[in-house]
Amino acid sequence: MARFTRWLRRNIDAVLALLISVVVGILALADVLGTEEDQINAAILIVLALLAATLLRDRRSAAQALESASAVRLLSGLEVSQAHAEARHATELWIFKGGTGTYLRAVTLKECIEIARREKRLLRVQLEVIDPTDEALCKAYAQFRSSLAPGPDGTGEEWTLVRTRKESFATILAACWHRQRCASFLTIDVGLSRTMTTFRWDVSSRYVIMTQEDPAAQALMFEKGRPYYDAYNRELVSSFRQAKRVHLDNVGELQLSDEPTIEETRRLFTQLELELPASFSERDITDIVRKALRAKNPYP
């Protein structure tokens, strides 16, 4: 009975057309509707009306299907950077999960902060990058990036274990540096992932942009209010909860200079309980500071 009810609901238009045709035919035989021509015209009009209703319903279904399909946009080449620029506009939120956050430091974080300052809005930032103190994890990430494109990337550097650790440390330093200077409107949290991801997620108040580490690969964009925006948002929140939190409040009274010194940088990571590798020289630390404040765009 339930199956018949579902079938009837799906095919009600055709069923009604059939019933009306049968009824009109019976009435015609009984000579109730007047002349034969009147009977035929009445039947035709009613059936045409039902056919029109059916077409309208199908058109609405097609429109809904098209709208659902447009919920996911494929992006290639310049479309990716254009989508990021659109996402940064008027956003009050930015969630990032990826490798080391090079593009985040070079473009995203600076522009989001500048837009929020100019428009006098609050900005909440959540960052999740790989743990720079996990040597095995950083080595695996460096090997993965090198396998995608051997040789220097858009920054002019090759992916090595040392570079990977520097990039991730630089993201943490950048978060602390901007946090101190924009405390009136910026809230920023940092988590360190214990696993490597081959994707990058960027979430703004309006969009989720999902890219791959390979710049030649297509990206996906999901708009708020459409399927998957909330799902991916929840996914990143859940992932962040499982990440190793960097307690930025532990910085205490340490005030970073406009150009943090080597001593300030060492002290910062000590207070964050993220000791720099003993093998890192002063030149390496200077490089971390440069990457934190003046990172090169890897996708110019």
Task: Give the predicted meaning of each segment.
Residues 1-80:
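N-terminal alpha-helical membrane-insertion module
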Residues 127-139, 149, 160-167, 224-229, ...:
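Low-complexity, flexible helical/coil segments
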Residues 141-199:
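HKD-type phospholipase D/PLD-like phosphodiesterase module
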Residues 187-227:
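HKD (HxKxxxxD) catalytic microenvironment of the phospholipase D
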Residues 210, 215-300:
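Signature of lipid phosphatidyltransferase scaffolds
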